[in-house]
Amino acid sequence: MTTEEAMPEKAKCPTLEITKQDFFQEAKTLIAQHYEKINENKVQGTSINVFRKKHQKPKSGKYIPLEIDKKVTRDVVQEHRAALRRICFPKELSKSEHLQEPPQRISFKEPHIFSRRERCRPIDLITKGQVKLDKIMTIIEPVSKKMETAKQQHFEESRNRMLELLYPFPVHLYLQPGTSNLELLKEPDKAFYDWRGFVLTRSFRLACDSRRVSFSQSSSIFRDYYSKTFKTLIKKERQPIKPEPKSQPRIKGTPNKTDKLDSKVKRIGPHIEIFQVFRERKKFMITPKLIRMVTVMQAHVRGWLERKRLQRVMTKALDHGPDMKAVINMYGRLIHRVRYRRGLWRTRQILNLAELEEWMDRKKFYEIMFAKREDWPKIERNELPNFFSDCGHFPTQKQVDDTWDLVHQDGKEKYSELIKKSKAIEMLFTLYPPEGAHVPDSTLLKSTWLRPIVNGEEGYRYIVNGHPALKRANIRVVGKLVARSIRERKMRQHYKSCKVE
């Protein structure tokens, strides 16, 4: 029965009949191969040296996690120790034969399981020389997987915390060793925040086509984990980071009554005209240099104005005579006659272009008005008041007769009923002398009730034409004014007669 029971066990699980020394050597090689596979498939750290230059080679640095859960590591180490105690390695193992892991990214303190102080308990299977390989592998493999997963979880948590503190954008990417920050900026038209803090219109992709990590069959957990993380990162990369919205100016609400009043009352103080009158004016310093500058400027301006006026006078003179000299002589003789008829013996005049231009304009206007009325070169004497009114003058009949006598002193045309154009125009210049004659106001026409003159302008033209500015006077006020003036005149005549007697 014992032989029959032993046969199916051998069929199910093959046993290895070896000596004690061969078994230890085989277990040693198996464990070493297992750790070598794990170390080959491990991913190197993802920390990027952003200050590394292009010519520098990437350095493999160790990453020390911030915090490690001691309880979890203690349980894993204890399980590993228990599994190795079951295998019961010999006491003769020296320090040179210890299994040492290559330096990793994480400074993880491994237990010294092969120390000489630890004593292994003997097992019956070793004394018998029969050990099952499948049991050894089933014991070792889950314990090593648990240890690796615990290390990887601690590594990922600590690395993500550090990256969140160092970088303003989520770069929890598993980059290959040797990649720089310049390789991230490859594709245009996408915005993200790089390590310097400002927005760039470029995107980044992981250059993992040629540098993909080769995972072995034993590290399938890492392969699944990395495939999931790469997919999530690619999805996040396709979504461009939206820039922060610009701060818009605040829209003011409806103004209150106080705001309206404040806007109306812009300044509290006196009126601007009163302020200008009473304010202190700054004294303007007049220096000889400033006087010379002003004099030169005025000379330039006045010279330009006089030259322009001379050009106008020369063009207008062609309408009154053959040349400029003949027109000036004509103007001088007319001024001499006007002053002589007014009783002024100093008939010398100084030529002024402005006065000459004024006389030429008036003479041209009178000639046009005379041409409208004449059927031949002469008009009748009784048509003179109408001719004068067309020219804008309203003298009385007595003034017209007196001027007729002054103009026709020779006696030949004095009793004629026809008048030429030249004599009619000269009568107007005698009644209303030009500016060049310089006749005093005492010899000019006086203002009367029927022919008022205000500031040298006849008011009768407004009465005749019916100007809207004129108002109908109150007859009582006018009667009182006329009666007072008549009474004063009679009283003056009475006092004069009393003095003579």
Curated annotation (Swiss-Prot):
Ranges of residues in domain IQ = 290-319
InterPro entries for this protein: IQ_motif_EF-hand-BS
Q: Cross-referenced PROSITE patterns, in alphabetical order? A: IQ
Compositionally biased residues, Basic and acidic residues: 237-247
- Residue segments, region Disordered: 237-262
Protein's UniProt name: IQ domain-containing protein M
Question: Could you tell me the gene encoding this protein?
Answer: IQCM
